[in-house]
Amino acid sequence: MVHLTAEEKNAITSLWGKVAIEQTGGEALGRLLIVYPWTSRFFDHFGDLSNAKAVMSNPKVLAHGAKVLVAFGDAIKNLDNLKGTFAKLSELHCDKLHVDPENFKLLGNIIVICLAEHFGKEFTIDAQVAWQKLVAGVANALAHKYH
C-alpha cells in the first residue's frame, strides 16, 4: 500500500483536473510501445505498430491509452483503496492477458514523463514525488493478482 500525505494527494488531484486524457493517454501508451517494443506483443491486434509514426497515429493505440488514463482517474478517486479499485483489472491482466507486471511500472514511469512534459514548471519536484508514488501504487495493485 502506498501512503500519500494530504499534500501529495492535493498535488495529484490538482494536476489531474488539467490532464488531457485522450492526448496524454495516447502519448503514454504510444511511448511505451516505441521505447519498449517488446510490449507491442500484447497489442498485435492493433494493426500497424512498425515504427514510431505508425504507433503515434494508430487510433487503437490512442483509444486504449485514453482508456488507461480513465483507469488512473478511478485510482485518483480511490487513493486509499488502489488494490480494490484495480482487482478486476489485475485479474484480467494476470489470468487472461498474461502481462508481465513489470510493464505496469514501465507505463507508470512513462505517464510521469508525459505529465512532466505537458505541465513543465507546474510539474514540480513535489508533484513528481506524489505521482511516482501513485504510479508505483497502481503498478502494485495491478500486480496484486500475480502474488
Swiss-Prot record:
- Which superkingdom, per the lineage? Eukaryota
Entry-annotated residues carrying Phosphothreonine? 13
- UniProt KW Acetylation keyword: yes
Which GO MF terms are attached to this record?
A: haptoglobin binding; heme binding; metal ion binding; organic acid binding; oxygen binding; oxygen carrier activity; peroxidase activity
Per UniProt, heme b binds at 64, 93
GO cellular component terms, A-Z: blood microparticle; haptoglobin-hemoglobin complex; hemoglobin complex
Q: Give the protein family.
A: Belongs to the globin family.
Role: Involved in oxygen transport from the lung to the various peripheral tissues.
Q: What is this protein called?
A: Hemoglobin subunit beta
Native organism: Notamacropus eugenii (Tammar wallaby)
